[in-house]
């Protein structure tokens, strides 16, 4: 019982600040057309990219966002990997990793 309480005390603060994959998916859903080979990203897409970058302001948040992006990239059937990698730059932001199914999110730092 004491161990369970200790785990809850240690894990709860970390979970509270973590970015959810639902939020990542929601923010980037306007990017789907571009990510599957469509023309440049829409203003709504870039707004979502910028919102996500602003929300990921700690190393754990950036790693969580990276893992969500990696998972989402793997679930997009016709993902254009070049467009995925170019997305941040097309939106005028810099993220410290490539949006890819092969990214090692454990190496992402703030």
Curated annotation (Swiss-Prot):
SMART domains: AAI (SM00499). It comes from the Eukaryota. Pfam families: Tryp_alpha_amyl. GO terms for biological process: lipid transport. The keyword Nucleotide-binding does not apply. Disulfide bonds join 21-68, 31-45, 46-91, 66-105. Transmembrane segments: none annotated. Keywords: Disulfide bond, Lipid-binding, Signal, Transport. InterPro entries: Bifun_inhib/LTP/seed_sf, Bifunc_inhib/LTP/seed_store, Plant_nsLTP. GO terms for molecular function: lipid binding. The keyword Translocase does not apply. Residues 1-17 form the signal peptide. Plant non-specific lipid-transfer proteins transfer phospholipids as well as galactolipids across membranes. May play a role in wax or cutin deposition in the cell walls of expanding epidermal cells and certain secretory tissues. Belongs to the plant LTP family. PANTHER family: NON-SPECIFIC LIPID-TRANSFER PROTEIN 2-RELATED. This is Non-specific lipid-transfer protein 4. It comes from Lens culinaris.
């Amino acid at each position: 019982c004491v161990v369970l309480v200790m785990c809850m005390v240690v894990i709860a603060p970390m979970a509270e600040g973590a970015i959810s994959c639902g939020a990542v998916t929601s923010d980037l859903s306007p990017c789907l057309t571009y990510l599957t080979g469509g023309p440049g990203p829409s203003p709504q897409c870039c707004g979502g990219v910028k919102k996500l970058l602003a929300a990921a302001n700690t190393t754990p948040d950036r790693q969580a966002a990276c893992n969500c992006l990696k998972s989402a990239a793997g679930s997009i059937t016709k993902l254009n990997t070049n467009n995925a990698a170019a997305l941040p730059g097309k939106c005028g932001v810099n993220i410290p990793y490539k949006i890819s199914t092969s990214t090692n999110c454990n190496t992402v730092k703030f």
